[in-house]
Amino acid sequence: MAVAVAMAGALIGSEPGPAEELAKLEYLSLVSKVCTELDNHLGINDKDLAEFVISLAEKNTTFDTFKASLVKNGAEFTDSLISNLLRLIQTMRPPAKPSTSKDPVVKPKTEKEKLKELFPVLCQPDNPSVRTMLDEDDVKVAVDVLKELEALMPSAAGQEKQRDAEHRDRTKKKKRSRSRDRNRDRDRDRERNRDRDHKRRHRSRSRSRSRTRERNKVKSRYRSRSRSQSPPKDRKDRDKYGERNLDRWRDKHVDRPPPEEPTIGDIYNGKVTSIMQFGCFVQLEGLRKRWEGLVHISELRREGRVANVADVVSKGQRVKVKVLSFTGTKTSLSMKDVDQETGEDLNPNRRRNLVGETNEETSMRNPDRPTHLSLVSAPEVEDDSLERKRLTRISDPEKWEIKQMIAANVLSKEEFPDFDEETGILPKVDDEEDEDLEIELVEEEPPFLRGHTKQSMDMSPIKIVKNPDGSLSQAAMMQSALAKERRELKQAQREAEMDSIPMGLNKHWVDPLPDAEGRQIAANMRGIGMMPNDIPEWKKHAFGGNKASYGKKTQMSILEQRESLPIYKLKEQLVQAVHDNQILIVIGETGSGKTTQITQYLAEAGYTSRGKIGCTQPRRVAAMSVAKRVSEEFGCCLGQEVGYTIRFEDCTSPETVIKYMTDGMLLRECLIDPDLTQYAIIMLDEAHERTIHTDVLFGLLKKTVQKRQDMKLIVTSATLDAVKFSQYFYEAPIFTIPGRTYPVEILYTKEPETDYLDASLITVMQIHLTEPPGDILVFLTGQEEIDTACEILYERMKSLGPDVPELIILPVYSALPSEMQTRIFDPAPPGSRKVVIATNIAETSLTIDGIYYVVDPGFVKQKVYNSKTGIDQLVVTPISQAQAKQRAGRAGRTGPGKCYRLYTERAYRDEMLTTNVPEIQRTNLASTVLSLKAMGINDLLSFDFMDAPPMETLITAMEQLYTLGALDDEGLLTRLGRRMAEFPLEPMLCKMLIMSVHLGCSEEMLTIVSMLSVQNVFYRPKDKQALADQKKAKFHQTEGDHLTLLAVYNSWKNNKFSNPWCYENFIQARSLRRAQDIRKQMLGIMDRHKLDVVSCGKSTVRVQKAICSGFFRNAAKKDPQEGYRTLIDQQVVYIHPSSALFNRQPEWVVYHELVLTTKEYMREVTTIDPRWLVEFAPAFFKVSDPTKLSKQKKQQRLEPLYNRYEEPNAWRISRAFRRR
């Protein structure tokens, strides 16, 4: 009855009146009558069935259609019953009356419409006319055209001489009238006003058309100039012969009244009128009235520090100065930016106070300069030596004099923005090195996110676990604690071995300045108890030491191997299906031949005549290895007809027709060419892995296939969730490749396992000792866990004695060299059995024959983003039901098998999600949002994601981009953001690299970014750890690990990229060569975008500033109690023991990443000055008010000095009240 009432209410209306109540009663009476009829004829009295019959009768008003609908739904009613029901329903259920109200019917809002109202910033209109990057051919054509124009253009020197001659003739003949001068001035003013109005009208347009606007403005200005003016030949000439310089020339040479006030950025002649200890006053010439300005002591000379102003200038001396800023009649000047002989501007990009700067001034700058920030103007480039130097302190009388001058309005406070009213300290005059600066987070939200950030909304972390209190979640937490215990036990063993060294020898190790022989003996003694070889005993036994041979062995030829694959029998049907459909979903088991054969079949069918065949892979290693295999089968060299492209490595040529690439590289190609015009077919392989890039490609390619009817899209998956892919891609047909499957027996545990690692090893030993022949596959979460399991299992098997059959233990994880990974494909020798202990890479990416037994603990390690803390973490979580089925299927490929699930059946049913959470819903999306914005996609809510990411993650990503300067106050991409999108790096690294161009250290930053992109630069052999540490310490820099990496690369470069040098210094030569390749790629990108690559020499402060500009979110301050505390969330972190700063413990640092092992460790740490945080991230940090308690100080606990007569907390006010 309740269902009937609810349905009646939904059908009739939401606001019940007398008529509505009567209609509800009529509907209930009808339901009751239909139930009676059904009970009389069929013996069924079901209200739900009665309501269903009523709904069918309302949709089908005639007898024939009503009968047909009933038969279609499986009803076996007689004609008499059908006619009675239809007559009864039509009689008792009157038709709905049309609405008499004049108000329009309000439809209920969909979920997406509600989200659009809540988050308007996420649904801004897209910008289809987004600028795309030019390829190398376009750049070459443009350069050739500019060279031709340059050849036709008269020289600049000739134009200057011609102007000077005309000016001299005009001056001598005195034929120019004042009325004509006034008219020309008026025309120029009108022209400027028109330009300003034009800018105001176009200010709200899309930022992607900024380059076109600038070009049109400059063209219009050139058309309005004299007939003798030639068009500019390039962007530099545009600035050189721009309107601003033309006005300056007229100001100097045309006879007209001088201006009343100076212009910011212009250069004037002047005379020194007075000298102070902090600078000198200069009277400007060429103005109508007397105008004086201050040249600060730091603005006098570029070369070195000035101790005494009188050493540089004298009273009455004539100088050339540049106007930096002025407030009222008080002006700030600079001499160091002007050549005192020629008057040339040595630093034209510098601005000091932009408040008075007109929009026309800024419009003349190069729009592609990457120094534009929507939040903060880029910090000025100071003189060559940027290190902070202690200057002479200002005397008390001088301080008093400055205060009196400010109080008398002779000097303005605005000229000294950092002036401290209490102490009278001027900026950069007497900075205190040991000043304790308090930095706080800016509480203000970005304008376009007001009310939506974590400051005003409760942002919860993404839930990737179905039941956080279930047995699987508890087992995952228990395993983390057990792993920590095992690490600590190993550490204690090592320390015990160290303590066993005789004290007489150990003193040479403790002594900071020992003799060489004693140090060597101590180093050797420290190796006691260590493994004498790099390879542990279990690993030597597994891989056969140095005598092992790697590679999958087979007697079949390449053609026979191809014909043995399951997909070969379906070759013709597959090619025909691709021909008949624009989008095709291909489902096939791992090892069926999808990845290697489909591209070749389509190439043989002639699809390469229309373009390339592109195939994406979720992993770099897969793209490289598959391309190598296909090139062998195709009969060509790798890089010719078949090639691959991964980040920082392009192994293709103009002849390439089959191209394998990572999904991220195809996404970058979409950034350049949204329609992918050079491809005829795109194949998204391993789509079931649902990486971030794959999910974004789904939405982009959906649009592309609608624009390009000639393009084919193939989506392949190894799992059985094909229906979801088909529904997403316009109900695309599904092509299934039948695999070799056998029945698999599923076995569950009766009780939950607390230590799944130990349970896995016990299960493996039971299988080995009791079950028939057949190899075993065990799924664990990561490298550390797998190595531990292999070591424990080897020791346990060894303890059973020689009579037990041999068990070959083989680990598999991504960090293992590929040649060692191939050992798992070799069959076990007769009388023995192999056990493969692998990560989830063996679920779908690897096909291992001979597996009959699968041990599944039910866990996987996933990267999860916490939007509250803004940190990505690797977390051990329960797998999904789809993953559990996939793992069990591994046991049924060779023959009937068994799957041992180390969890209960109830846990499988109640604690596991149906499918795993896509990566796009659990990771940081800053890079993804930046790429989408660069493609002109601003409406993120309407973007067709297969599974939409959480709103909290999108908002956090936009907030991060805003603080980096990539988004403006409206949430749209800035020029800096567009530049950042063109680098294949994380946004923070992009910002760091681009800012280094402005700071003049881009050559060093290129090297640092390249070294950060590779892993394991140093290595420590266990038998030579002391020597390796000693060699590494030679490269340590006091500034931090980033500059240590720079020192390593530069030393390698100075030693002519020598491999023996790397071996001698315990440095991975392969990692350095990889960094060198990455550096070349990044250098090419910077050259393509005309970004200067300059060196800072010994001025490493520039490098530190550049690092701070990108990684300011990762700032941490030393905590008085222990370690460091991050500024964002006050999390306790520690400097990693391998860091160059481990023994220095500086006050302020920024780190590259956090690593969770026994503690939260900071990796790649660099010291910073806290002032830089405010300088480079004013939208994120601010200097706390010294008159108020900051949040950090409020959290600190006051600990009194020891008093033997009182309790420690007796001094507190709360205790004093209690005593009363």
Swiss-Prot record:
Annotated InterPro entries: DEAD-box_helicase_OB_fold, DEAD/DEAH_box_helicase_dom, DHX8/Prp22_DEXHc, DHX8_GH2-like, DNA/RNA_helicase_DEAH_CS, HA2_WH, Helicase-assoc_dom, Helicase_ATP-bd
UniProtKB keywords: ATP-binding, Helicase, Hydrolase, Isopeptide bond, mRNA processing, mRNA splicing, Nucleotide-binding, Nucleus, Phosphoprotein, Spliceosome, Ubl conjugation
EC number: 3.6.4.13
Covalent link location (Glycyl lysine isopeptide (Lys-Gly) (interchain with G-Cter in SUMO2)): K140, K399
Broad class of enzyme this protein falls into: hydrolase
Start-end of Basic and acidic residues biased regions: 160-169, 180-196, 232-259, 362-371
Entry-annotated residues carrying Phosphoserine: S395, S460
SMART domains: DEXDc, HA2, HELICc, S1
Motif (DEAH box): 685-688
Catalytic activity as recorded in UniProt: ATP + H2O = ADP + phosphate + H(+)
Record PROSITE patterns: DEAH_ATP_HELICASE, HELICASE_ATP_BIND_1, HELICASE_CTER, S1
GO molecular function terms attached to this record: ATP binding; ATP hydrolysis activity; ATP-dependent activity, acting on RNA; identical protein binding; RNA binding; RNA helicase activity
Span of domain Helicase C-terminal: 756-936
SUPFAM superfamilies: Nucleic acid-binding proteins, P-loop containing nucleoside triphosphate hydrolases
Bias type Basic residues, positions: 170-179, 197-210
Superkingdom of the source species: Eukaryota
Effect seen on changing K594E: In GET; inhibition of pre-mRNA splicing and nuclear export of unspliced RNA
GO cellular component entries: catalytic step 2 spliceosome; cytosol; nuclear body; nucleoplasm; nucleus; spliceosomal complex; U2-type catalytic step 2 spliceosome
Start and end residues of each Helicase ATP-binding domain: 575-738
Subunit structure: Identified in the spliceosome C complex. Interacts with ARRB2; the interaction is detected in the nucleus upon OR1D2 stimulation. Interacts with SRRM2. Interacts with CACTIN.
Family the entry assigns: Belongs to the DEAD box helicase family. DEAH subfamily. DDX8/PRP22 sub-subfamily.
PANTHER family cross-referenced by the UniProt entry: ATP-DEPENDENT RNA HELICASE (PTHR18934), ATP-DEPENDENT RNA HELICASE DHX8 (PTHR18934:SF85)
Domain notes: The RS domain confers a nuclear localization signal, and appears to facilitate the interaction with the spliceosome.
Role, per record: Involved in pre-mRNA splicing as component of the spliceosome. Facilitates nuclear export of spliced mRNA by releasing the RNA from the spliceosome.
Name this protein carries in UniProt: ATP-dependent RNA helicase DHX8
Originating species: Homo sapiens (Human)
Gene giving rise to this polypeptide: DHX8
